[in-house]
């Protein structure tokens, strides 16, 4: 059993999910220590309404800025905490720390990022990397933390649609367990007029939900668990930061955010 997965970012803007021929959607949430995808919630709320499996990823070293892994993971969690436990999460690691080749320093960075996510949320993220990186470094410490692999490997850069058995070089992915294969960045599928990243998830909806629901404790703020006042404070800070616009637009977005939660809890 496999799921056909698209992953999207702000490049796709306010993409409409319902018409698209896919089984699951992963959306970029944050990047580095200062980038938030303003379209993320719009996409995820559609997935929740459609009862479609959803995921969320953080892009490491956004804009080429090399930050402390705990700083980046805290930024990811703090901006996306309301989704943890509902969606699969992943770390997207593509930029080498030294700007050239990947070393054990990159492995350590990923490990520390992931460990902080686990510590604060209980959720074990997937790791997204190019398949070629697996043989360049020793990833055992990451894999031994029960981190599943979402790897990218393309046959070419031609347009393609959904494939049940996409090309792969046949090399082992040890020490990882492969969870997902992104096989093109030029996917063309029904319901969207443009290129999309296409992946196959090797499992069913229940398997997806196990990755999403792996946490067993409230999300902490790095110390004590977050209570309702902390959530309200975080929400208010988002409002003050302009994430909900101004005037009538702000009122509508705040109302909609609360109403979406009410609708979700009343199901």
What do the PLM-derived regions correspond to, one by one?
Residues 65-66, 135-136, 266:
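Short secondary-structure boundary/hinge segments and terminal tails
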Residues 87-168:
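Catalytic domains of cell-wall/extracellular-matrix polysaccharide-remodeling enzymes
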Residues 240-251:
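Extracytoplasmic Gram-positive cell-surface binding/anchoring modules and repeats
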């Amino acid at each position: 059993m496999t799921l056909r997965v698209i992953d999207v970012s702000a490049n796709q803007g306010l993409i409409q999910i319902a018409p698209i021929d896919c089984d699951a959607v992963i959306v970029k949430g944050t990047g580095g220590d200062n980038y938030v995808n303003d379209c993320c919630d719009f996409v995820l709320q559609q997935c929740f309404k459609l009862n479609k499996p959803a995921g969320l990823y953080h892009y490491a070293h956004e804009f080429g800025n090399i930050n402390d892994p705990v700083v980046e993971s805290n930024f990811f969690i703090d901006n996306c905490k309301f989704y943890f436990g509902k969606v699969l999460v992943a770390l997207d690691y593509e930029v080498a720390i030294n700007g050239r080749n990947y070393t054990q320093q990159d492995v350590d960075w990923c490990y520390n990022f992931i460990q902080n996510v686990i510590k604060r949320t209980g959720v074990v993220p997937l790791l997204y990397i190019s398949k070629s990186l697996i043989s360049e470094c020793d990833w055992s410490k990451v894999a031994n933390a029960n981190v599943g692999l979402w790897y990218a490997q393309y046959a070419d850069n031609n347009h393609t649609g959904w494939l049940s058995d996409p090309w792969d070089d046949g090399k082992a992915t040890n020490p990882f367990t492969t969870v997902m294969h992104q096989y093109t960045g030029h996917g063309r599928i029904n319901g969207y007029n443009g290129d999309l990243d296409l992946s196959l998830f090797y499992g069913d909806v229940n398997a997806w939900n196990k990755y999403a629901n792996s946490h067993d404790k409230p999300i902490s703020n790095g110390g004590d668990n977050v209570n309702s006042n902390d959530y309200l404070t975080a929400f208010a800070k988002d409002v003050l930061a302009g994430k909900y616009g101004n005037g009538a637009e702000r009122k509508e977005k705040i109302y909609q955010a609360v109403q979406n939660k009410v609708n979700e809890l009343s199901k």
